[in-house]
Amino acid sequence: MSDLVICKTSTLQENEIVNDNNGQYKVFGASGIIASIDNYQFDKDAILVLKDGSKAGKIQYASGKFSVVGTSVILIPQNEFDAKYLYFAMLAIDFCQYKVGSGIPHIYFKDYSSEKIYYPNETQRNRIEKVLTTYETKLAVEKRMLSALQKQKAFLLQSMFI
């Protein structure tokens, strides 16, 4: 993997973010997009790997211009490697084996940088990426529907016992 990506870090802390949600650039944290601000740190598609805490090893995909809280490393594909394909390939990596630390778990790029990633020709990559993106989109829709149904259930149960 180390020959496919450049590893960057961020020093941005959550308490430094003034979030009025009117900014045009996303800020990624451990739970996804946490704010919108008026400036950005990165302007290339990247894979974000959470490096600290109970969710260490969680993978996110960031595109466009964005910023990242310092709890993640930013893996930027080099030499025009396909970021979205690398994101999907990295989802198959078991990062638990790289966690260290007893109190707050950490993972380090130096430990998982030797992971091998299958990188087929462009036609195959595009086909794989298209299929997985379709499933990812469908999954997001299903999660939103489930959330809406859970809210409806809670409302109906509350209405029954007033």
Label each residue range with its predicted role.
Residues 1-12, 17-28:
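Non-catalytic DNA-recognition/assembly elements of restriction-modification systems
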Residues 3-6, 87-91, 158:
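Generic alpha-helical structural context detector
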Residues 13-14, 103-104, 113-119:
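Short, recurring structural edge motifs at helix starts
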Residues 15-18, 99-102, 143-147:
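A short, aromatic/hydrophobic, helix- or strand-capping loop or linear motif
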Residues 29-91, 100-104, 108-112:
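A short beta-sheet element
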Residues 118-162:
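Amphipathic alpha-helical coiled-coil/heptad-repeat segments
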